[in-house]
From Swiss-Prot:
Comment on protein domains: The alpha-K amphipathic helix mediates targeting to the phagosome membrane via binding to phosphatidylinositol-3,4-bisphosphate (PtdIns(3,4)P2) and phosphatidylinositol-3,4,5-trisphosphate (PtdIns(3,4,5)P3).
Protein name per its UniProtKB record: Immunity-related GTPase family M protein
Residues the entry annotates as binding GTP: 86-93, 111-115, 193-195, 234-236
UniProt entry tagged with the keyword Nucleotide-binding: yes
A Gene Ontology biological process term: defense response
Task performed by this protein: Immunity-related GTPase that plays important roles in innate immunity and inflammatory response. Acts as a dynamin-like protein that binds to intracellular membranes and promotes remodeling and trafficking of those membranes. Required for clearance of acute protozoan and bacterial infections by interacting with autophagy and lysosome regulatory proteins, thereby promoting the fusion of phagosomes with lysosomes for efficient degradation of cargo including microbes. Regulates selective autophagy, including xenophagy and mitophagy, both directly and indirectly.
Originating species: Rattus norvegicus (Rat)
Superkingdom classification of source: Eukaryota
Protein keywords: Autophagy, Cell membrane, Cell projection, Cytoplasmic vesicle, Endosome, Golgi apparatus, GTP-binding, Hydrolase, Immunity, Innate immunity, Isopeptide bond, Lipid-binding, Lipoprotein, Lysosome, Membrane, Mitochondrion, Nucleotide-binding, Palmitate, Phosphoprotein, Ubl conjugation
Amino acid sequence: MKPSHKSCEAAPLLPKMPETSTHNAPLNLSFPSVPSYQIGCSSLPEISRSTERALKEGKLPELVYGVKETVATLSQIPVSIFVTGDSGNGMSSFINALRIIGHEEDASAPTGVVRTTQTRAEYSSSHFPNVVLWDLPGLGATAQTVENYIEEMKFSTCDLFIIVASEQFSSNHVKLAKIIQSMGKRFYVIWTKLDRDLSTSVLSEVRLIQNIQENIRENLQKEGVKEVPIFLVSNLDPLLHDFPELRNTLQTDLSNIRCCEPLKTLYVIYEKIIGDKVANWNQIIANGRLKSSLGVRDDDDMGECLKRYRLIFGIDDESLQQIAHGMGTVVMEYKANIKSQDFHTLRRADWKLRLMTCTTVNALFCLFKFLPCLCHCFKRMRHKRMLLLVAKDTKNILKKILMDAVSPPQI
């Protein structure tokens, strides 16, 4: 078997990619707040245009396939992970355990009681496609400062960091965490030798784990480091303790790092398309062309008009069923995100529409039929409100499609 790693002297990992300033900004799509990058993929513009066309035409089931294709393309983007910490903390052993390979295998990272990692070395894993795991030389073996270490190891080229610790959470670990946080990067703290701690401690397993976690948090909080994921593992047991949770968290964060910014951009485009569509229909309503444009016999029949609006925007029952099928889930996952399933449900959910259609207003509406201008004004208000609510539901469905494409719902 050919080794899947190679040593290098701090060569650049990837072409330097510009970071966005959205790390601390609220995310419209409610993705976890992780650093994200504007990474170019030649096929993405055409895929994006196809989804935009589908949205303009109210064909959301077609949009689903374009979004899934977008996420599949983004998933091929390489991501670099730096594994760092003090010398002797078991960083190389951790990399082998994370990849679920034995130390004796050709592709494994060299391990030993003496310092084995002298230069940066990169590794790959079938469990994390298109991910480069970088095993960095341990910090603290020389008089080198943390700042010089970070510069020499090219921290600015990394997407996600793993700070490895064992026995004690040192000042070097805290400095690393503080600097990485100031860079706006995502990172975890991994305690790697839990098996040894459990075998030597007089405390119960629950109490020992609690003590380790509290100690790490206290040291970080003293230096103003915000809440960070902490995982306690044993390098000897790659399937036990927090390893499964770590791998799941890592998979989620990898998806967010790759997809978050492009999908946020796509959602902004979708919002504009919906806004333009609402403006166009508001003009139709204002011009008194609603009946012919909607294709209804009676534009005072709010229930029938609602069905037409839902069809125009692509969130009618049949479309929702097709969307759910395309996303591999049940239709109720999507119906639960809308209020416009029928007119009575929508009316109950929105007090303004309820007021516009209450008995008193309906009686006035009948009287105003003898005053065409006032009658038209009331009708326009009702339809504009209902149109706005359908547009809002459409945005909710689009948001869910984008989120589910990255993290499919569990059914």
